C-alpha cells in the first residue's frame, strides 16, 4: 500500500504540541482592522487549538504529524 500524502496546505497552518493537540492561528487578522477594537485585535494575536470534533478530520489531512 502506498504512503499517505500529507495535505501541505494544512501542514503549513498547524503545529502539533507535545501532548498531540494541534495549535492553530486565528482568522480575521489580515485586513479590515480599523473597525475592530484593540481588545479584539489583541485576542486574535493569541493562538488557539483545534476542537475535539475536528481532530479526526485533521488526522486524515496530517497523517504523520
Swiss-Prot record:
<dbReference type="InterPro" id="IPR037229">
    <property type="entry name" value="Ribosomal_bL35_sf"/>
</dbReference>
<dbReference type="InterPro" id="IPR001706">
    <property type="entry name" value="Ribosomal_bL35"/>
</dbReference>
<dbReference type="Pfam" id="PF01632">
    <property type="entry name" value="Ribosomal_L35p"/>
</dbReference>
<comment type="similarity">
    <text>Belongs to the bacterial ribosomal protein bL35 family.</text>
</comment>
<dbReference type="InterPro" id="IPR018265">
    <property type="entry name" value="Ribosomal_bL35_CS"/>
</dbReference>
<keyword id="KW-0689">Ribosomal protein</keyword>
<dbReference type="GO" id="GO:0022625">
    <property type="term" value="C:cytosolic large ribosomal subunit"/>
</dbReference>
<dbReference type="GO" id="GO:0003735">
    <property type="term" value="F:structural constituent of ribosome"/>
</dbReference>
<protein>
    <recommendedName>
        <fullName>Large ribosomal subunit protein bL35</fullName>
    </recommendedName>
</protein>
<dbReference type="GO" id="GO:0006412">
    <property type="term" value="P:translation"/>
</dbReference>
<keyword id="KW-0687">Ribonucleoprotein</keyword>
<dbReference type="InterPro" id="IPR021137">
    <property type="entry name" value="Ribosomal_bL35-like"/>
</dbReference>
Amino acid at each position: 500500500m502506498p504512503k499517505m500524502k500529507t495535505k501541505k496546505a494544512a501542514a503549513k497552518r498547524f503545529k502539533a504540541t507535545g501532548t498531540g493537540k494541534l495549535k492553530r492561528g486565528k482568522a480575521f487578522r489580515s485586513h479590515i482592522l480599523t473597525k475592530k477594537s484593540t481588545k479584539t485585535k489583541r485576542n486574535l494575536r493569541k493562538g488557539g487549538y483545534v476542537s475535539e470534533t475536528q481532530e479526526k478530520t485533521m488526522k486524515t489531512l496530517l497523517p504523520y504529524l
